[in-house]
Amino acid sequence: FFFSSRRRHTRLVSDWSSDVCSSDLSKLKVFSKNFNMNNNLLLFKKNKSPIGQKIIIKGKVINRRGNPLKGIIIEIWQANAAGKYRDKNDTHDAAIDPNFLGYGATKTNSNGDYKFKTILPGAYPWGNHKNAWRPKHIHFSIINENISNRLCTQMYFPNDFLLNYDPIYNSIAKKYRNSLIAKFDKKNNIVPNYLVFTFDIVL
């Protein structure tokens, strides 16, 4: 299941957002109609692993009062380790990984917690300006029964020098930028298999 609108950026927190993703999934082009709730993006092909550094993304979804939100649907989609989306409209000349779809979904538990297993996405060139590259990022879509539209954002990774040159990231007010960068979770890092990152979401 994969969206052709992959490069659309929408800010998540309503204080600094005026846009949302379309809630009408019929308007989105998909590669597969076999939607399933799977938070392990490493299991696209049985007994085969995608190329790249394995990572875990975990976090908590809360409201502005700090209360955890249960049953929130979180979708993610991303490029593979070479910076290539599994998207027929992607013109980047990197190779498609046959063992990686680049899409996952899960629901928050009663404590508002969620978790994904995936690979670290690669940066990729894009046509916004000369020599332009997008930093490593993962797209997030947040769906709540009480939200009429899907809220979307992008999660970035710490210490990525390409953030300094990315017009999408830099269009965000400085005081909010750090909220879009995942935190490396050294305490829960699983050596040697996974790097662990924390990304909390406030609705």
Predicted feature residues:
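Single conserved hydrophobic/aromatic residue that forms the stacking wall/gate
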Residues: F1-C21
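Beta-strand-dominated extracellular/periplasmic modules and repeats
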Residues: S23-I181, I190-V202
